[in-house]
């Protein structure tokens, strides 16, 4: 079962597009650089089903299935991914994005992320391309 993350365009026609397997509207103008290819490789090395997307100049979103089992996450590669985001991608914030708004940090993978230092993103602080009514997000400030 695959989950789908929908990002909204902030243009007048309110189109939205599934993130999984397609280029999102927010990064259609991002060049295919060695750094972005390496980012994709590093994300997939943590968990093969994960995706990533730029969420502005200094933020990236890691798209994680809502039912992610923490035992399937390669922990040292996850730490390597966070270091890569800081040192190579030069981002200031990594946002874990889940395709369900009803998740909490009380259980599941969000609970694990809390112990690593991720904090819940309040709906009013979501990046403009994420819909707070259909997503749960946690942020890690690099």
Swiss-Prot record:
The lineage of its organism: Eukaryota, Metazoa, Ecdysozoa, Nematoda, Chromadorea. Ornithine decarboxylase (ODC) antizyme protein that negatively regulates ODC activity and intracellular polyamine biosynthesis and uptake in response to increased intracellular polyamine levels. Binds to ODC monomers, inhibiting the assembly of the functional ODC homodimer, and targets the monomers for ubiquitin-independent proteolytic destruction by the 26S proteasome. This is Ornithine decarboxylase antizyme. Belongs to the ODC antizyme family. Signal peptide: none annotated. One of its GO terms (molecular function) is ornithine decarboxylase inhibitor activity. GO terms for biological process: positive regulation of protein catabolic process; viral translational frameshifting. It comes from the Eukaryota. Residues 1-19 have a biased composition (Low complexity). Interacts with ODC1 and thereby sterically blocks ODC homodimerization.
